Amino acid sequence: MTADGLGCEANADAAYGWYEKALAVFHAAEEEKPWKYTEYRIGKMVAAGLGTEQDYLQAADWLTLSANEKYKYAQYSLGGLYYHGKGVEQNHEIAFALYTRSADQSFPYANFELGKMLRDGIGCEKNSVEADRRFKEAFLGFVFLEEKGHDDKLQYRLGWMLLNGVGTEMNETKAKEYFEKAATVGNPFACYQLAKLILSDEKIQPQEVEKALGYLRKAVEAENPYAAYFLGKLYEKGEHVPKNISEAVRLYTLSAEWDNDFAAYRLGKLYLGGEGVLKDVEAAIRWLTFAADRKNPFAEYALGILYLKGEDVPKNVSKALEYLKRSAAQGNQFAQYRLGKVYLMGEDVQKDITAALQFLTAAAEQGNQYAQYTLGKLYLMEKDIPKDKEAAVRWFTLSAAQGNVYAQFFLDHIDEFKDPSVLLAGTRLLHHMSRVFADNAPPLKPPGQRADRKLLRKLREKKQAQGHARDDYEQTMSL
């Protein structure tokens, strides 16, 4: 209560003192008579650094003692340490086993973690049926616990599951009710989600807008990075509030300082483009690097293009390729397309048709119309690879279906290009339109995907949590 300011003013020093006393009591009780509960409590406090220095290694030892006595709470907590590799060597299989032992004793939090692991195939084989069963058990368990204790964290979790249809039928109305309960006592995550729900209503009334903005500001005061980022986006775009880039930058900075890589990416973009702020390449690089270090694929792509072009920073092809490959490995179709073009043209690196085809195909299969168009030309021209008219038609068709008029041109005249020289003449006629395929092309919704689905889903969930639309790629093909 002293730490959280419940019933009194928050006082971290006083709270530490109380935790220290509590820890001493647990140690004394354990010395007198070893007990799984005290071992668990000591392990949790040491892991969190409550009343003592944080020490995951020591925490793992205490939790292991308790878990070996089949204490479900310790099994769950120890499973988390193994999952994240804190105090122990990371081992998803052991984490899965510990979560299973805990879940089999009807602990809903363990069931929830098992659901995620089974869904993603982490530490086990993918099993969507079993994942759904575990999620349903988790949901029912959370409902039971919430009815007994009316905990705001449980209310938020239940709202999230109802909103996303995890372990239960999707029900936005019920989700909103849970968020409202949690927001009443100031739960920052609930405040944030509730604000997003309110603002998503196309027929929203002015008084509701003010209510939503109030929830967002309340969440920002509680240092919620997602709320700060979302509110920053509203100010940047001038949605529901007067456009104010300075306020957007302030909120993005707060969010980034609270470790939000998307906010850091936006800051990098703003400072690099001088969009409403004084252009500051040094600050842009600093924030983009901050985001890239946290595996943000858009920041990795942005840095890759920067170092490849060498306009605002000294050209560094090696660095550029490193960042582009990191971004491409996370399924960024724009990075895949750019790498394909780099290896195809052989201007900054040794020409590598095999690598070019690999990256272009990866981008094309995600629906990148420029990669599809490029592949169509490659298969038709018979210059770097054997001619494959069927493949050319397939890629041109996919590109044209997205409105690519140049792909449509080739489809309309496909039989006229029997002689490569005629084809070359045709492409020269279209040369003045080639800027459409330059790096400033806007992203389009992909009809399919090839990249690692687990990586893409994690990124998508992370973006949606921060208020992005499902098909919002948060970037164009250039900076």
Region spans (language model):
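TPR/TPR-like (Sel1-like) alpha-helical repeat modules
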Residues: 20, 131-140, 390-405, 409-419, ...
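Non-Sec secretion/translocation targeting segments of pathogen effectors
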Residues: 450, 457, 461, 465, ...
